[in-house]
């Protein structure tokens, strides 16, 4: 394996995310705004499932195809602030998402977890959410691109179509 430390990372699809990072995140919380727009806009907003207290959404700036996020409808910034029922629903939706990802993409593994707080890597730090990132051998680390360009074999729209039906 060749040494890749201090190499350039090429992930052009994340540029829009990086540019938006300097904006005031509390200006508009996507995890509040998107569900509030109603289920008729779920395809446009990439919401693949709505539960009682949580929903599942595709990451608009994915690390890999099928990168899901599970978020509560309640606007809270930390896991301890959530009621036990909501935390349990988040875990059940993550498990369900992994089952659907398994059937759809057959990943070799997953990264599942929370980035709570900006210093921990949270892009939307004021609304707790869980990442479910399918992984394949050869994608190197949490970022699918390290030194060489990785081709995303599917558009977000194709990922939505492939995954949304599994939650029904």
Which role fits each region the language model picked out?
Residues 1-168:
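HIT superfamily nucleotide-processing domains
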């Amino acid at each position: 394996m060749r040494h890749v430390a201090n190499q350039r990372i090429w992930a052009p699809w994340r540029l829009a995310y990086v540019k938006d990072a300097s904006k005031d995140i509390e200006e508009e919380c996507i995890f509040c705004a998107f569900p509030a727009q109603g289920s008729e806009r779920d395809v446009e907003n990439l919401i693949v499932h709505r539960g009682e207290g949580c929903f599942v959404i595709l990451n608009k700036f994915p690390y890999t195809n099928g990168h899901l996020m599970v978020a509560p409808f309640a606007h809270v910034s930390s896991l301890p602030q959530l009621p036990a029922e909501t935390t349990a629903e988040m875990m059940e939706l993550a498990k369900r998402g992994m089952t659907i990802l398994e059937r759809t993409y057959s990943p070799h593994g997953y990264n599942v977890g929370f980035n709570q707080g900006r210093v921990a890597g949270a892009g939307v730090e004021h609304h707790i959410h869980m990442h479910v990132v399918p992984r394949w051998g050869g994608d190197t680390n949490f970022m699918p691109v390290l030194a060489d360009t990785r081709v995303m074999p599917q558009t977000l729209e194709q990922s939505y179509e492939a995954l949304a039906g599994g939650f029904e």
